[in-house]
Amino acid sequence: MTGEIPRGRRWSARTTRASRLNSPLRAFLHTETGSARVLLAAAVVALAWVNLDESSYESLWGAVFSVRLGSWQVSHDLRFWVNSGLMTFFFLVIGLEVRRDFDLGELRERRRLMLPLLAGIGGILAPIAIYLAFNAGKPTAVGWGVVMATDTALALGMLAVLGPRFSDRLRNFLLTVAVVDDLIVIVVLAIAYPEHPSPMALFVAAGIFALVLLIRAAGVRWGPGYLLLGVAAWLAVSESGVDPVVVGLVMGLFTYAYVPARTELQRAADRFRLFREQPSPQLARSVRAGLASALSPNDRLQHIYHPWASYLIVPLFALANVGVVVDRELLARAATSPVTLGVLFAYVVGKPAGIVIASMLVPRLSHNQFRAPVGWAAIIGVGTVSGIGFTIALLIATHALHGPALDEAKVGILVATVGASLTTWLVFRLAARLAPARRARALLGASEGIIDLMVPVDPDRDHVRGPREAPVTVVEYADFECPYCGQAEPAVRELLVDYTSVRYVWRHLPLTDVHPYAQMAAEAAEAAAEQGAFWEMHDLLLAHQDELRPADLLRYAERLDLDLDRFREHLADRRGAGRIAQDVDAADLSSVSGTPTFFVNGRRHHGPYNIEALSAAVMSAFASARLRPEGGREPDHRSEAGSEQPDEEPGT
């Protein structure tokens, strides 16, 4: 059941209830390039500030702030509260994202963790070896921990700026490698650089973490309770001499992620209807609790803390720590300093070498049981961008080194950040010069991704728009009354005009608990499909989402010149209900609970459904399709603007 999309024609109109929710500011805040720019700006401000007025810089960050409760108090300077207090929330966000990948992403197949894990370890050992080669036998050898870490936030931002446009696999690989680094770094901070170690306080912290696991296993979902336990763990770890940022990472890894269940969403909708009929404080609390319980704790916490961590906390950290007085004396000393040279070569050479060598050896030694999720160019790119240690390297440097050695390490970290960024740009620039098929293999590799769509597309059964056979298939579970489906519709249409080798599949998922006319509209579309006009009816229904009553449906059928008696009979007998129920069952199998939900070549699409995001997912799928024997041909993705094309569209 296929229909062709008119070529050479763009839809500029929006459905009645559709509106563009994106603004330039919102788009900026939802990109990693935005946070990377803010971070770099903060670093520049710190360098300018300390070189113009060092006394005011140091007096601010050295100011002591205390928290007192009776006779008990905690006193630290402002730099500590940023480095070990606010940065706990940054590590919380990192832990949340890794846990989400464990629960819903590629790492839910645990075997896929092995190679990034070993690559991360390789990316730690090689830099340490290079740093120690420069500093062996010197007091500065104690700073070997400085070269271990990757600044996850800045590395991801630089990858978004310098890397290929369609880099989800690349991003996930980098994230896993970087988090392995962060976990090991935290262990090293605890063991190698403790301040006034207290085993008893560490034992108390371990007990608190165990309590968190117990109450989570018991199904307790009271957020303030977890917050109090997190604060208690932070205080205990701080008293133990270990950097308390570890608490954020551990709590993030403890916070599970899941797709909202449709039953939970329906229950929340039922509570809202009760509140609508009889508003009261008790029902208001019930509605809030129902809405919160439908979403995973991981999603809720990421939504709260990710913007703060990216746009406030990490830039504040850079502002507090990057400041170093750069003068001729320091530069002359750094040019020959084993600390500076050790840090520079460890990050620019050691990081990529360790990651690349480990990624090459693991598949060979495991007889391809553990394969890289990306290609060789992407592995090299991940290696080079992992050489951006920046904020995390500065964090360790403040623990490991002091005095002139600390300033020399900061110079090395800053120069290494620039060097790693330049080599990353060069790697992806060279990869971009490869022929398309070779470039796809170099960036994506040959490993298969996880398929999320449980019921495969059947062109004889499904409603297909575009070519019957295509290298890329976009499946949408949608609801004709859903306003968000209306917002997605213009993007889908533009996608099909831009990429003529894509086939688009509509599957019904009427959310009858919130959209009273969605089921009837879906059945009307099936009634039109019986007469060869599914897509014409589909377009009318989405264009008039506020007009889906029975009389409206009959008016649309008349406008399409359908046999009205046959159309009425189809609706009266509810002949399309069984077909719609099959789509709903298929949605349940794929853990689809809301609309619109998109799948691109079987992979669930996470994120916005605007034309930019969908185009990125489609182009990534095209690149992967080229690696398969049946997808080796180069598709004509883009139609030429202004070409003569028919104005009318065949039916189903």
From Swiss-Prot:
Q: Which GO terms describe its molecular function?
A: sodium:proton antiporter activity
Record field: transmembrane: 32-52, 78-98, 114-134, 142-162, 173-193, 200-220, 227-249, 306-326, 342-362, 376-396, 411-431
Which parts of the sequence belong to the Thioredoxin domain? Answer: 429-623
- Provide the alphabetized UniProt keywords: Antiport, Cell membrane, Ion transport, Membrane, Sodium, Sodium transport, Transmembrane, Transmembrane helix, Transport
What does the record say about its membrane topology? Multi-pass membrane protein
Q: Tell me the segments the record calls region Na(+)/H(+) antiporter NhaA.
A: 1-428
Region: Disordered, residue numbers = 626-652
Reaction equation(s) it catalyzes: Na(+)(in) + 2 H(+)(out) = Na(+)(out) + 2 H(+)(in)
Has UniProt tagged this entry with the keyword Transmembrane helix?
yes
| Localization per record | Cell membrane
Task: One GO cellular component term, please give it.
Answer: plasma membrane
Q: List the disulfide bonds.
A: none
Question: What processes does the entry annotate via GO biological process terms?
Answer: regulation of pH
Extent of Basic and acidic residues compositional bias: 627-641
- In which broad location class does this protein mainly occur, judging by the first location in its UniProt entry? membrane
* PROSITE patterns reported for this sequence: THIOREDOXIN_2
Q: What InterPro entries does UniProt report for this protein, alphabetically?
A: Na/H_antiporter_dom_sf, NhaA, Thioredoxin-like_fold, Thioredoxin-like_sf, Thioredoxin_domain
Entry's family note: In the N-terminal section; belongs to the NhaA Na(+)/H(+) (TC 2.A.33) antiporter family.
Listed PANTHER family: NA(+)_H(+) ANTIPORTER NHAA, SODIUM ION/PROTON ANTIPORTER NHAA-RELATED
Report the function annotation for this chain.
Answer: Na(+)/H(+) antiporter that extrudes sodium in exchange for external protons.
Q: What is the recorded name of this protein?
A: Na(+)/H(+) antiporter NhaA 3
